[in-house]
Amino acid sequence: MFRTKRSALVRRLWRSRAPGGEDEEEGVGGGGGGGELRGEGATDGRAYGAGGGGAGRAGCCLGKAVRGAKGHHHPHPPTSGAGAAGGAEADLKALTHSVLKKLKERQLELLLQAVESRGGTRTACLLLPGRLDCRLGPGAPASAQPAQPPSSYSLPLLLCKVFRWPDLRHSSEVKRLCCCESYGKINPELVCCNPHHLSRLCELESPPPPYSRYPMDFLKPTAGCPDAVPSSAETGGTNYLAPGGLSDSQLLLEPGDRSHWCVVAYWEEKTRVGRLYCVQEPSLDIFYDLPQGNGFCLGQLNSDNKSQLVQKVRSKIGCGIQLTREVDGVWVYNRSSYPIFIKSATLDNPDSRTLLVHKVFPGFSIKAFDYEKAYSLQRPNDHEFMQQPWTGFTVQISFVKGWGQCYTRQFISSCPCWLEVIFNSR
């Protein structure tokens, strides 16, 4: 019997599904710590981002993540549940095949392209009926039935569960990317089911003191940089020089300049590499190596840093991050295969005198900056805010390696590869 192309595409898609219980590569789970955590052990090593993360919590510098109800990477999985797990796998396979076989050949090809590229290539939306729910269970084929979590899934949720996050349970755990046609639409007739047009939401958690909080100690600017402007707690000075003798701090505060909403600086340890990148479009990709990449390519910058650690981390940046300005603030989506670490004043408690470092796993999104919260942080009688009005408008992002009291790196200036994002407060 001749096998049709559609059947071959369905089998190929199923083989490309996300691993359910196998160990991920070291970088996905432990790239942030990598043997550099103080008192490291099971806390960081078992938190995997590509397939897990459970409730999607963004941990502090410890990188703690809550595993989902499915119990991925449990050190001692209960043997009594082996049969149930096998039955669930068979049910999921039957349901997935029944859904995929209803798709047209062109739709299957589009889905396969998105899955195999792992989001590295911009792929089109896969528009399918939005009111179809998929019932997961014995003798329950895909049909339009009332949602009964966790046994009933919408089509986008099912495909995300199969191809990205096996522990995914509810639509509230994911966020649609702004590049998607279904972004911002409520109950559309056709909804995009491309699993790489959605991201997993990070849920902030309160860290157990005293492990994740550290004082905001300022370092002095270097003597050779008279124009240095302290823009962050750790670097102590970022020497921004703009054409015409104006510092970038003055440029950011020019009332008539509204062409950009933020600028990005790339650092390798204590050295800034390349020029500032002004962002005008609502979305920006920051990457080292990205197929069909369009944005801020770190791989094209000339770096004289010969450190093996810097070169190793640089090679792991890969697809990097996506920075998007949306209605409720600025979001960061981790497109790479390794965790990123973020510090932002608007992610922390407004009453706190210290800031947290949040670990964001691959495939996860976090609202890294909130304009309303940032404005509320400005205190007119505070000398620091008077001298540096954009201090609360700065976000720091480190690739692969974390920093803070939990790590040997106390300051972000010790991280191999990191970004400083300064938002235009006007």
Curated annotation (Swiss-Prot):
Disulfide bonds: none annotated. InterPro entries: Dwarfin, MAD_homology1_Dwarfin-type, MAD_homology_MH1, SMAD-like_dom_sf, SMAD_dom_Dwarfin-type, SMAD_FHA_dom_sf, SMAD_MH1_sf. Pfam families: MH1, MH2. Keywords: Acetylation, Cytoplasm, Isopeptide bond, Metal-binding, Nucleus, Phosphoprotein, Transcription, Transcription regulation, Ubl conjugation, Zinc. It is found in: Nucleus; Cytoplasm. There is a cross-link at residues 64, 70 (Glycyl lysine isopeptide (Lys-Gly) (interchain with G-Cter in ubiquitin)). One of its GO terms (cellular component) is plasma membrane. Ubiquitous in various organs, with higher levels in brain and kidney. The modification N6-acetyllysine is found at residues 64, 70. Phosphorylation on Ser-249 does not affect its stability, nuclear localization or inhibitory function in TGFB signaling; however it affects its ability to regulate transcription. Phosphorylated by PDPK1. Residues 261-426 form the MH2 domain. A motif (PY-motif) lies at residues 208-211. The keyword Metal-binding applies. Interacts with COPS5. Interacts with STAMBP. Interacts with PPP1R15A. Interacts with NEDD4L. Interacts with RNF111, AXIN1 and AXIN2. Interacts with ACVR1B, SMURF1, SMURF2 and TGFBR1; SMAD7 recruits SMURF1 and SMURF2 to the TGF-beta receptor and regulates its degradation. Interacts with WWP1. Interacts with PDPK1 (via PH domain). Ubiquitinated by WWP1. Interacts with TSC22D1/TSC-22; the interaction requires TGF-beta and the interaction is inhibited by TGFBR1. PANTHER family: MOTHERS AGAINST DECAPENTAPLEGIC HOMOLOG 7 (PTHR13703:SF44), SMAD (PTHR13703). Belongs to the dwarfin/SMAD family. This is Mothers against decapentaplegic homolog 7. The gene is Smad7.
